[in-house]
């Protein structure tokens, strides 16, 4: 079987009539796996959250696959302790003849058995990164690498909600949105809610909730949640050990528990993972208009 990159369909069936990358029915991830797409404003800590959440699931005995969906391919380095080659780079080496590849060419084992894939993407300003994500899922299925997986986490580029980078929503059961307690992060979160509302018309994805990150307080997030119907699933304060874990190229679970804040962060990730496994009730949130967010947030 050969993976061939072909132009994505321009059918207008999804969301509000936008041109989007559509899921081939054959690419559906097997029922039984918990599939989570992690979104949020660029630089908010999605890769940190995704990797530590993957590690937490593995600590609970689950078989985990994390798929980095960013051309920077830096999603999984705290799990693998290195920058791994991307799927698109490996495919280019074999002129996109996927039958020449072995799983070990593009899937790398990380901390506590977490399997890691970096989809990569086209050069800046060209192509569709979301379509590359679709090809990554296709390649994983060709090699039967999704059949024995309990949890799949898509770590998605920034807050881009075009048809391409909304593609992981087509595979996901739940979307988690990482945000801080500030206007820009919450504004981006609202746009992501809009994208999920569009995808939920045709796909199974639903909102799982919000991860408050690098925030001492959550008052602004709480305001937004109350108005839209969202909920906060986990709260991570600005703990220096998290920053240092990135510099050490490891997950928070590899840091010394005696360091300040480490054990509390580990426990919060384990609680988040367990709550997601317990089939969290999906949310029917309603996004706000831009002006409504502007008027809602801030101090009296």
Swiss-Prot record:
Keyword annotations from UniProtKB, A to Z: 4Fe-4S, ATP-binding, Chlorophyll biosynthesis, Iron, Iron-sulfur, Magnesium, Metal-binding, Nucleotide-binding, Oxidoreductase, Photosynthesis
Name recorded for this polypeptide: Light-independent protochlorophyllide reductase iron-sulfur ATP-binding protein
SUPFAM superfamilies found in the cross-reference section: P-loop containing nucleoside triphosphate hydrolases (SSF52540)
Biological role stated in the UniProt entry: Component of the dark-operative protochlorophyllide reductase (DPOR) that uses Mg-ATP and reduced ferredoxin to reduce ring D of protochlorophyllide (Pchlide) to form chlorophyllide a (Chlide). This reaction is light-independent. The L component serves as a unique electron donor to the NB-component of the complex, and binds Mg-ATP.
Cofactor(s) needed for function: [4Fe-4S] cluster
Organism name: Synechococcus sp. (strain RCC307)
GO biological process, one term: photosynthesis, dark reaction
Gene Ontology molecular functions: 4 iron, 4 sulfur cluster binding; ATP binding; metal ion binding; oxidoreductase activity, acting on iron-sulfur proteins as donors; oxidoreductase activity, acting on the CH-CH group of donors, iron-sulfur protein as acceptor
Gene from which the chain derives: chlL
């Amino acid at each position: 079987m050969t993976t061939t990159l072909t132009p994505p369909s321009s059918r207008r069936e999804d969301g509000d009539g936008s041109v989007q990358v559509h899921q081939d029915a054959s690419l559906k991830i097997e029922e039984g796996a918990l599939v989570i797409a992690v979104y949020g404003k660029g630089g908010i800590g999605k890769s940190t959250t995704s990797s530590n959440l993957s590690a937490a699931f593995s600590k609970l005995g689950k078989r985990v696959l994390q798929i980095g969906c960013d051309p920077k391919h830096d999603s999984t380095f705290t799990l693998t302790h290195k920058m791994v080659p991307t799927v698109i780079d490996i495919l280019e080496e074999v002129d996109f003849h996927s039958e020449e590849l072995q799983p070990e060419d593009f899937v790398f084992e990380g901390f506590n058995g977490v399997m890691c894939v970096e989809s990569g993407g086209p050069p800046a300003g060209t192509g569709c990164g979301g379509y590359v994500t679709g090809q990554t899922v296709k390649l994983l299925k060709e090699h039967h690498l999704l059949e024995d997986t309990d949890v799949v986490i898509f770590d998605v580029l920034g807050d881009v909600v075009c048809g391409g980078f909304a593609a992981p929503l087509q595979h996901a059961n739940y979307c988690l949105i990482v945000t801080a307690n500030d206007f820009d992060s919450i504004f981006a979160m609202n746009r992501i809610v809009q994208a999920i509302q569009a995808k939920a018309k045709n796909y199974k994805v639903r909102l799982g909730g919000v991860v408050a990150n690098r925030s001492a307080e959550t008052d602004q997030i709480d305001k937004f949640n109350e108005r839209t119907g969202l909920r906060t699933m986990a709260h991570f304060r600005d703990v220096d050990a998290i920053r240092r874990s990135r510099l050490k190229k490891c997950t928070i679970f590899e840091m010394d528990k005696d360091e300040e804040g480490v054990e509390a962060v580990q426990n919060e990730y384990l609680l988040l993972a367990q709550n997601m496994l317990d089939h969290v009730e999906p949310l029917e949130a309603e996004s706000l208009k831009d002006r409504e967010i502007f008027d809602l947030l801030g101090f009296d």
